[in-house]
Amino acid sequence: LSAPFHYADFTVDPAPTRDSLIRQLNDDHVPVIGLRVTPGFMNLNGGILTEPGPPTDGHAVLLVGAARYTGPDLGVVEPGDQLMCIQNSWGTSWGANGYALIGPRAWDDMVFVSALLTPR
């Protein structure tokens, strides 16, 4: 292959945990996440996706960050909740400029696989 393409190896985790994915982020990796798309995900316009929903399809996104929520209890997001930040490929009109925060209930319901690409 010639630049900008490169060969890569990959490992698949069929049951990724938030902690294992955060360790990958801390090691400067960007995990690819397989998730079940819900109507809330499809139509996300800013904000945080907090509630699971009926799956309508599958999709892959990049996990680019994680944060622990420290604000007041909002009912759908509580202090201490771990929010996962993803980057989608659907352009800047989706989510918040192409990114979204996913709350723990939605994350646990939607995510079913991760893959980690590593250079050869």
List the predicted regions and their residue ranges:
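Predominantly the structural core of cysteine protease catalytic domains
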Residues: 1-87, 92-120
